C-alpha cells in the first residue's frame, strides 16, 4: 500500500514541498534562512494574535494598553518582547536570505526573486505600521515623518497623505487603520510566501556552485529537516537571549514616552532595520529626490537579474566580485550607522558618499567587474 502522504490530496502537496523534495546535495547553511523566515512568520503571527487580544487601537488607550499587557497580563511582557525582538530576528534572517541570493546568483530564478522583493516590501510595510501601534513618541513622529514623505508626489501628494491619515494629522483614524493593516498584512505575507515556494519548486533550489544539480539530488527529509531544526534552535536561542536579557537593546527609549503632538523628539529615527534606507533618504537635500532614492534603494533588487553580465552564476569562483559584494555589505552597515546619527557634520557627507557608493556598486561596478572576469576566463 502506498503511503498516505503520497496519495492524499493535501498531504501530497506538503510531501512534495517538505519531505520528498529533491534538493541539491551541496547546499550550505546559507540555505537555512528560508525555513527560519517561515518560523519567524509563524512566531510573529502567534505572538501578535495574543497581543491583539489585549491591545486597544485608540489614541487615548493604546499606550496604556501596552503597559497593561506588560504589567497585568500573564506573561504579557514576554509575549510583547518576543514580538518586538522577533521582528528584528525576522529582518536579520531576511537580509541574510537576500544576501545569499545576491552572492550565489539565486536571482536568476526571476519569478521567485520578484515575489521575494514583493515579500520584502510587504514585510517592511508590516513592520512600519506595527511600530506605530504602541503610540509612543517615536511611534507617532515616525508615522508623521514617513507618511508625510508621500506629500512629495506631485499633484496628488497632499491629498494622498490626508487620505492615509484619515484627517489633517496622524490621529485616532490613522492608528485604527494601521492596526487593521498590521493585522491583515501577515496573512498576505503567508500567501505570498506560498507562491514564492511554488515558483521555487518549479525550478528547484540553486546551490553554492551555481551549476545545475539535477544529477545530484537528495530528499529534503531527513537530510535538510535535521539541519533546519538545528538552525531553528540557534534562532530561538538568540531570540530568547535577546528577549530575556536585553529586551530593549534594539528599541528606542523615546517610545516609553506617550505620543505628544506638541513635542518633537530630538532625533526621529526608525527601527534599526530601516536605518540604511533612512540614511539614503536623508542624504538627498531634495524631498522628492530623497523619496525616489529611498524607493529605488529597495526596488533596485528587481533589476539585479538584468544587470547580470557574468558567465558564471555564483560568486563562489569570482574573487573580484566577492570583494565588491563584501564592500556592499560594509557600505550597508555604514548606512545603517549613519541613519541612527544626527544630521550634522561629518555624518552628512559620510551618508552621501555611502549612498552614492551603494548605487554605484550595484549599477556600475559589479556588472563591469563581471565582464572583466569573463575576459580573465579566456587567459
From Swiss-Prot:
Binding annotation for a ubiquinone: 201
InterPro entries: Cyt_b/b6_C (IPR005798), Cyt_b/b6_C_sf (IPR036150), Cyt_b/b6_N (IPR005797), Cytb/b6-like_sf (IPR027387), Cytochrome_b (IPR030689), Cytochrome_b_C_euk/bac (IPR048260), Cytochrome_b_N_euk/bac (IPR048259), Di-haem_cyt_TM (IPR016174)
Pfam family, one: Cytochrom_B_C
Gene Ontology MF: a single term: ubiquinol-cytochrome-c reductase activity
Chief location bin: mitochondrion
Binding, heme b b566: 97, 196
Bound cofactor: record note: Binds 2 heme b groups non-covalently.
Origin superkingdom: Eukaryota
GO cellular component: mitochondrial inner membrane; respiratory chain complex III
SUPFAM superfamilies: a domain/subunit of cytochrome bc1 complex (Ubiquinol-cytochrome c reductase), Transmembrane di-heme cytochromes
GO biological process, any: mitochondrial electron transport, ubiquinol to cytochrome c
Transmembrane segments: 33-53, 77-98, 113-133, 178-198, 226-246, 288-308, 320-340, 347-367
Cell compartment(s), UniProt: Mitochondrion inner membrane
Topology class, membrane: Multi-pass membrane protein
Keywords: Electron transport, Heme, Iron, Membrane, Metal-binding, Mitochondrion, Mitochondrion inner membrane, Respiratory chain, Transmembrane, Transmembrane helix, Transport, Ubiquinone
Cofactor(s) the protein needs: heme b
Residues noted as binding heme b b562 in the record, renumbered to the chain: 83, 182
Subunit structure: The cytochrome bc1 complex contains 11 subunits: 3 respiratory subunits (MT-CYB, CYC1 and UQCRFS1), 2 core proteins (UQCRC1 and UQCRC2) and 6 low-molecular weight proteins (UQCRH/QCR6, UQCRB/QCR7, UQCRQ/QCR8, UQCR10/QCR9, UQCR11/QCR10 and a cleavage product of UQCRFS1). This cytochrome bc1 complex then forms a dimer.
Function noted in UniProt: Component of the ubiquinol-cytochrome c reductase complex (complex III or cytochrome b-c1 complex) that is part of the mitochondrial respiratory chain. The b-c1 complex mediates electron transfer from ubiquinol to cytochrome c. Contributes to the generation of a proton gradient across the mitochondrial membrane that is then used for ATP synthesis.
Extra information: Heme 1 (or BL or b562) is low-potential and absorbs at about 562 nm, and heme 2 (or BH or b566) is high-potential and absorbs at about 566 nm.
Xref: PANTHER family: CYTOCHROME B (PTHR19271:SF16)
Identification of the protein by name: Cytochrome b
Organism: Lissodelphis borealis
Amino acid at each position: 500500500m502506498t503511503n498516505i502522504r503520497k496519495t492524499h490530496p493535501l498531504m501530497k502537496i506538503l510531501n512534495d514541498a517538505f519531505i520528498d523534495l529533491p534538493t541539491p546535495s551541496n547546499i550550505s547553511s546559507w540555505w537555512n534562512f528560508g525555513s527560519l523566515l517561515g518560523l519567524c512568520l509563524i512566531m510573529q503571527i502567534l505572538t501578535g494574535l495574543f497581543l491583539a487580544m489585549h491591545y486597544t487601537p485608540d489614541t487615548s488607550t493604546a499606550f496604556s494598553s501596552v503597559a497593561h499587557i506588560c504589567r497585568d497580563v500573564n506573561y504579557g511582557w514576554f509575549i510583547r518582547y518576543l514580538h518586538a525582538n522577533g521582528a528584528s530576528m525576522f529582518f536579520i534572517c531576511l537580509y541574510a536570505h537576500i544576501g545569499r541570493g545576491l552572492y550565489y546568483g539565486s536571482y536568476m530564478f526571476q519569478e521567485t526573486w520578484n515575489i521575494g522583493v514583493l515579500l520584502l516590501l510587504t514585510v517592511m510595510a508590516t513592520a512600519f505600521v506595527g511600530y506605530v501601534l504602541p503610540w509612543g513618541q517615536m511611534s507617532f513622529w515616525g508615522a508623521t515623518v514617513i507618511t508625510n514623505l508621500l506629500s512629495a508626489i506631485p499633484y496628488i501628494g497632499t491629498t494622498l497623505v490626508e487620505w492615509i491619515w484619515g484627517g489633517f494629522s496622524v490621529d485616532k483614524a490613522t492608528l485604527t487603520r494601521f492596526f487593521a493593516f498590521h493585522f491583515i498584512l501577515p496573512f498576505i505575507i503567508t500567501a505570498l510566501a506560498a507562491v514564492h515556494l511554488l515558483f521555487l519548486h518549479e525550478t528547484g533550489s540553486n546551490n553554492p556552485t551555481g551549476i545545475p544539480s539535477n544529477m545530484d539530488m537528495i530528499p529534503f527529509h531527513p537530510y535538510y529537516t535535521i539541519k533546519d531544526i538545528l538552525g531553528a534552535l540557534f534562532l530561538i536561542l538568540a531570540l530568547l537571549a535577546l528577549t530575556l536579557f536585553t529586551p530593549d537593546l534594539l528599541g528606542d527609549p523615546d517610545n516609553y514616552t506617550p505620543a505628544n503632538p506638541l513635542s518633537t523628539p530630538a532625533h526621529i529615527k526608525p527601527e534599526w532595520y530601516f536605518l540604511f534606507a533612512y540614511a539614503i533618504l536623508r542624504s538627498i537635500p531634495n524631498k522628492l529626490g530623497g523619496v525616489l532614492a529611498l524607493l529605488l534603494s529597495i526596488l533596485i533588487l528587481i533589476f539585479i537579474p538584468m544587470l547580470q553580465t557574468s558567465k558564471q552564476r555564483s560568486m563562489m569562483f569570482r574573487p573580484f566580485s566577492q570583494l565588491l559584494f563584501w564592500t556592499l555589505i560594509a557600505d550597508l552597515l555604514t548606512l545603517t550607522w549613519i541613519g541612527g546619527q544626527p544630521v550634522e557634520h561629518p555624518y552628512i557627507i559620510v551618508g552621501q558618499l555611502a549612498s552614492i557608493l551603494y548605487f554605484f556598486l550595484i549599477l556600475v561596478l559589479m556588472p563591469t567587474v563581471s565582464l572583466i572576469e569573463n575576459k580573465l576566463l579566456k587567459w
